[in-house]
Amino acid sequence: ESQSIKQTVDQLKSISIPEATQHRKGYRPWGWYDVLEEGDTFKVKRIYVKPGESLSLQRHSRRAEHWLVIGGEATVQLGETVLHLSTGESVYIPKREIHRLKNETQNPVYIIETQIGDYLGEDDIERLEDIYGRGK
């Protein structure tokens, strides 16, 4: 049976199916993300942030992002500005802008993140502060 799985994965790789080599769901200390759709210059994720948790204070050199809150209440730092976003509200994050999302409530936060740029790898991140001890 494991040989059959390997053959299936090899077939998927041969026709360039991204799921053959990339996980669509990623787990992080603050919650998780699920890649809903992606192309050469865009990626759409659903992101869940646990109560009391936050993403790194970070910036990206090769992509802009748009965050739409679809559940809960998020606190967003965008440069020196702090925004409080509720369900249905959104924020645009230009390339190289310092930003962070926090969930300061007792309820989950869900957002849709749309990334736009010429490179969308998870390694396009400069962490300026990270409460989980992840490197810059």
What are the functions of these language-model segments?
Residues 61-80:
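Glycine- and acidic-residue-biased ligand/ion/polar-headgroup-sensing regions
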Residues 36-39, 73, 92, 100:
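A structural signal for the main folded, soluble domain(s) of proteins
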Residues 50, 62, 69, 94-96, ...:
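A short, compositionally biased micro-patch
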Residues 79-98:
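Short acidic-glycine-tyrosine-enriched beta hairpin
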Residues 1-27, 104-136:
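Double-stranded beta-helix
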Residues 53, 62-63, 81, 97-98, ...:
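A generic "binding-loop/recognition-motif" signal
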Residues 23-64, 119:
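A short glycine-rich, His/Asp/Glu-containing loop-to-beta-strand
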